[in-house]
Curated annotation (Swiss-Prot):
Pathway: Cofactor biosynthesis; thiamine diphosphate biosynthesis; thiamine phosphate from 4-amino-2-methyl-5-diphosphomethylpyrimidine and 4-methyl-5-(2-phosphoethyl)-thiazole: step 1/1. Pfam families: TMP-TENI (PF02581). NCBIfam families: thiE. This is Thiamine-phosphate synthase. Binds 1 Mg(2+) ion per subunit. The gene is thiE. 2-[(2R,5Z)-2-carboxy-4-methylthiazol-5(2H)-ylidene]ethyl phosphate binds at residues 132-134, 163, 183-184. 4-amino-2-methyl-5-(diphosphooxymethyl)pyrimidine binds at residues 35-39, 67, 106, 135. GO terms for molecular function: magnesium ion binding; thiamine-phosphate diphosphorylase activity. PANTHER family: THIAMINE-PHOSPHATE PYROPHOSPHORYLASE, THIAMINE-PHOSPHATE SYNTHASE. It catalyses: 2-[(2R,5Z)-2-carboxy-4-methylthiazol-5(2H)-ylidene]ethyl phosphate + 4-amino-2-methyl-5-(diphosphooxymethyl)pyrimidine + 2 H(+) = thiamine phosphate + CO2 + diphosphate; 2-(2-carboxy-4-methylthiazol-5-yl)ethyl phosphate + 4-amino-2-methyl-5-(diphosphooxymethyl)pyrimidine + 2 H(+) = thiamine phosphate + CO2 + diphosphate; 4-methyl-5-(2-phosphooxyethyl)-thiazole + 4-amino-2-methyl-5-(diphosphooxymethyl)pyrimidine + H(+) = thiamine phosphate + diphosphate.
Amino acid sequence: MNAYRLYLVTDDQQDLPTLKHVVRKAVEGGVTMVQVREKHGDVREFIERAQAVKTILEGTGVPLIINDRVDVALAVDADGVHLGQSDMPAEIARQLIGPNKILGLSIETEDQLAEADSLPIDYIGLSAIFATPTKTNTKKHWGIGGLKMALNTTSLPIVAIGGINETNIPALSATGVHGLALVSAICHAENPTKAAEYLLSLMD
């Protein structure tokens, strides 16, 4: 199974009951990976939210990824970590989490892309494909053309992130990209189960 296919990134603006509801329903709809992202809260709150999501995911086969914080990933024994370019270097993160955890890295420029294959990572998050309200400090927008170029450049699986929604999923899927990461299209949906099912149907 391709675990990257429909990659849910949680919304750190949602309270804990909403977060749990979204994750539970999204997994019922076919989400294949969940990344808990916390940019504003304290570490204790991050651990609490990550632990709550881990409990929901137990027995589902859906991996739990922690955004940025290796310490939080270790604290809850998550399945992996996703690093940004300003986070801990990938080599150090790999030493800390060991050889069997999933390690992802955000790639924002062509120079970073060129180096990716030499790093001890499992996948890259290509950011941002399109403009997005959830991330305003992006270095560039790759677009479909940039995504195709990236797929030809690296041997690593690519998860596309940034501005992905029902209107552009068919074109993105046609590139052969390994996965699509979404926040708003699932977290803000009235029914996250139906949203996930619908988004998956657009990938076929």
